[in-house]
Amino acid sequence: MPTPKKGPRLASSPAHERLMLANMATSLFQNGRITTTLPKAKRLRPLAERLITFAKRGDLHSRRRVMRVIRNKSVVHILFTQIAEQMEQREGGYTRIVKIAPRVGDAAPAAVIELVTEPVAKKAVVKEAEAAAKVAEEEAPAVEAEATEAVEAPVEETAAAEAEAPAEEAADAEKAE
């Protein structure tokens, strides 16, 4: 039996695992959220995000790639029309996993995996970043000017001290004579 690419095997065979993940992805896209065990949710997340990325492309080849995994045409239609439009501004992170109380029957760690449908507040973040960059640029010349003055001032003081030092040595030499 080949070793799995990521994490422990969730089912008895690779084919069963692929089918189980495909069924969970179908349910996720139909309902928007599903409750499952934490390991299954963690294994479903990369598959669901990859399928949403294909849906955002929207071309025929991407639709056929999604149809390899999700066999239900109505769910594929929902994915390409509704979900892809909701995720248009989002650059990844299409799903969210929330841990919940352990399952009652066997105390397995349970989780809810859901689609993130909140709009991205990207423009406000960009404006704040630009404002911070402007402030940093304005402060940078002031800091450089202070650093230049600080470097020049000790040079003048040491030059004055060197000029005084020979005079003091000469005075000491005269006293010694």
Curated annotation (Swiss-Prot):
It holds the Pfam family Ribosomal_L17. This is Large ribosomal subunit protein bL17. PROSITE patterns: RIBOSOMAL_L17 (PS01167). Residues 138-149 have a biased composition (Acidic residues). Coiled coil: none annotated. The lineage of its organism: Bacteria, Bacillati, Actinomycetota, Actinomycetes, Bifidobacteriales. It comes from Bifidobacterium longum (strain NCC 2705). Belongs to the bacterial ribosomal protein bL17 family. Residues 150-164 have a biased composition (Low complexity). GO terms for biological process: translation. GO terms for molecular function: structural constituent of ribosome. Keywords: Ribonucleoprotein, Ribosomal protein.
